[in-house]
Curated annotation (Swiss-Prot):
A single Gene Ontology CC term: type IV secretion system complex
Gene that specifies this protein: virB11
SUPFAM superfamilies in the cross-refs: P-loop containing nucleoside triphosphate hydrolases
Binding site for ATP: G182, E183, T184, G185, S186, G187, K188, T189
Family, similarity comment: Belongs to the GSP E family.
UniProt-recorded name of the protein: Type IV secretion system protein VirB11
GO annotation (BP), single: secretion by the type IV secretion system
Length: 361
């Protein structure tokens, strides 16, 4: 008697063809997709590929990987997963036929004439706890302590000594989360660009802005993402600062550089920064360092999910996530010109808040 194999599904011919189309368009990337030592394959613009091997990025020129081919890859992938990618829906998240995760961003959400493709290869590595022990995996666990780390002590000493240039340089190098605050015309964006120059050139950077200002001529592994300035998450706009922040989580950034926080995307910024993406730099309008936290909390409340949180919880999260606030001012009336008026850095408060929560739980 023949058994009824109801769990065996034969893919239909159309699905097979769609998968074959995706695999055909992936052929220029096949050498790296098939390399077991490579974990991430990224295309920032036509003709070039960046691959991550052993936590380091490698660059490869691929002349035949042109714009039209990348557009076709996006279309084939969208059809495979029964989704859409177009000028009006320029961001696509999908799983490829062989199980890789892919994130595609096309114009107008990225630079004209470029397409961002990020492919995360699934890991088939298996380790036992004994394997981890032999590799020294458990040797660097830090106990929860009220004392500051050596890096925190170093930054605090620089700030207390008034050596603000060295303080900011080290804060960037140590991947602190930095918010530049000030009024309109105070020089926030210009200072942000100066801080970005202190980022190591081998890191992968993603910028998010509505107007192209954050140029990265010295960082080859970068992607510029754009959203319409009038786009609002509350109105279900397809591309907003918030949707691009969430997209970044699938694009393997070392750092995310958001030109300005204006509204509900502050909630997503907190999530991104709290998820381990250190070194993010952004700006906002605020009259002082302390008011920066109030302004950011009010922005979080503009988010559907953010407004479900009590105000004090939001403020606590901000103090835990934001490491440095730099307030800039344009002294047009007293002749002092553009300058830094305040710097907030308080690791002791951050540590106390963290320990307070741990003791309660």
């Amino acid at each position: 008697m023949m058994s009824n194999r109801s769990d065996f599904i034969v893919p239909d011919e159309a699905a097979v063809k769609r998968a074959a189309s995706v695999n055909f368009h992936l052929e220029p990337l096949r050498p790296w997709l098939d390399d077991p030592q490579i974990t991430e394959v990224c295309v920032n613009r036509p003709g070039e590929v960046f691959c991550e091997r052993a936590s380091a990025w490698e660059y490869y020129a691929v002349p035949n990987l042109d714009y039209e081919h990348l557009i076709s890859l996006g279309t084939a992938t969208a059809r495979f997963v029964d989704q859409d990618i177009s000028d009006s829906r320029p961001v696509l998240s999908a799983i490829l036929p062989m199980g890789e995760r892919i994130q595609i961003v096309r114009p107008p959400a990225c630079e004209h004439g470029t397409i961002s493709v990020t492919i995360r290869k699934p890991s088939f590595t298996r380790r036992t706890l004994e394997d981890y022990a032999q590799q020294g995996f458990f040797k660097h666990v830090r106990p929860m302590s009220k004392s500051l780390t050596p890096f925190e002590q170093e930054l605090l000493a620089l700030k207390e000594a008034g050596d603000y240039m060295s303080f900011l340089r080290r804060a960037v190098q140590l991947e602190r989360v930095i918010v530049v605050a000030g009024e309109t015309g105070s020089g926030k964006t210009t200072l942000m660009k100066a801080l970005m120059q202190e980022i190591p050139f081998d890191q992968r950077l993603i910028t998010i802005e509505d107007v192209p200002e954050l140029f990265l001529p010295d960082h080859p592994n970068h992607v510029h993402l754009f959203y319409p300035s009038e786009a609002k998450e509350e109105e279900n706009a397809p591309v907003t600062a918030a949707t691009l922040l969430r997209s970044c989580l699938r694009m393997k950034p070392t750092r995310i550089l958001l030109a300005e926080l204006r509204g509900g995307e502050a909630y997503d910024f907190i999530n991104v920064a709290a998820s381990g993406h250190g070194g993010s730099i952004t700006s906002c309008h605020a009259g002082s360092c302390e008011l920066t936290f109030e302004r950011l909390a009010l922005m979080v409340l503009q988010n559907r999910q953010g407004r479900q949180l009590p105000y004090e919880i939001i403020r606590r999260l901000l103090y835990l996530v934001v490491d440095v606030v730099v307030h800039v001012h344009n002294g047009v009336h007293d002749g002092t010109g553009r300058h830094i008026s305040e710097v907030w850095y308080d690791p002791n408060t951050k540590r106390a808040l963290s320990l307070q929560h741990s003791e309660k739980t």
